[in-house]
Amino acid sequence: IKSAKKVELKKDDGEIIDIQGKNIIIATGAKSRILPNLPQDGKKIIGYREAMTLNSQPKKIIIVGSGAIGIEFAYFYNTMGSEVTIIEYQDRLVPQEDKEISKALETNFKKNGIKIFTSSELINSKINGKSVSAIIKTANKEQTLNADIILSAVGVKSNIDNIGLEDVGIVSDNDKIIVDDFYQTNIPGYFAIGD
């Protein structure tokens, strides 16, 4: 993003061109948030994008995080027949939702065979050839869980690094571009939408 409502683009052949418009829409999407103790390799420890395009169904999957992304994939893989385990740092599933919703969801998931560890911290993860392990700390003890894949579902991070926001003066806070009710940034003619 450049000033004077210009965007610099790099074409497939390497040529760099400037495009100018009356308004600029910033819609750069998001990527999986990466935990230091859960580095994603895209094969055994994956993010939400890889979880949508696996070549084969895992027999066992550990899902770290129980927000919207984690819960959706837990339901999906359980329905497809995978053995699903959820690890959640907070004291309940979907901690942003009402407690009644969390309780009903947990009851339903357990009834369908999903294993749930709440108030549990992921200490470490390790790839062991064809399998992967997660070392977790619960209220009572440390234990190791094994699976074919670990899905990191601990949130998303906006793709706004190094795109020129600072050069133009567009304000961001906590990885989010600040917008008004019409999605316009603090700089007239620049809008931000999506993740």
State where each predicted segment sits.
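Short glycine-/small-residue-rich Rossmann-like dinucleotide-binding loops
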Residues: 11, 29-30, 138, 151, ...
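Rossmann-like dinucleotide-binding cores of NAD(P)H-dependent redox enzymes
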Residues: 52-53, 58-62, 68-142
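Glycine/Thr-rich phosphate-binding loops of Rossmann-like dinucleotide-binding domains
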Residues: 34-36, 71-72, 77, 159-162
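Core beta-strand elements of the Rossmann-like FAD/NAD(P) dinucleotide-binding domain
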Residues: 13-23, 140-149, 186
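Helical element adjacent to the flavin cofactor pocket in flavoenzyme catalytic cores
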Residues: 15-18, 27-32, 105-116
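Conserved N-terminal Rossmann-fold NAD(P)-binding element of oxidoreductases
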Residues: 26, 64-65
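FAD-site-proximal beta/loop scaffold in flavoenzymes
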Residues: 41-57, 146-195
